[in-house]
């Protein structure tokens, strides 16, 4: 019963957190209609539902590295005409990476997991799991870059990119060497906990985006997590 109440509480707080984001997008950035939205790290479709409910979207492309999650998405959204689901892993270059597929799939990541993390222990306790439950398994996944995907699919302008890839956000942005000039707005999540071993800091992302003419306009802490969500917009010429 306690676990059920906790999950309900988290759901409610997440709802208000997301509402804060969409209110900013609409009221401050004046974004109501979108031609192309890239949803990177689609998971089980949370952001697909969120953006579809709140914005008028002509075309959404959702990327999900996990084959299992992608199969789920293709079944769930088989009748959604403005949605393309891609079982592709995006990174800074083409190749292969080891993907840590977690039983609690929202934590799946290309980053190395710190098994001694206090945050991980708290999370596993919250989910009523133990290390004996094989919390994650390793898979080799092929990667590509956003530059290559956009070029191959003749996409020359993107209104909004959302990135939530559990510690791989910077690598994805680095795969935008050419086409970053064609992106208008970027929403991404950044972890400050010790569960994920990242080889970059928030300052690295911030400096990269500033160098490419983006400005940070929004920051909000995610409920009950050591993570923040940020919004950056392209500077007007």
What are these regions (language model features)?
Residues 1-237:
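Phosphate/nucleotide-binding beta-alpha loop and adjacent structural elements of enzyme active sites
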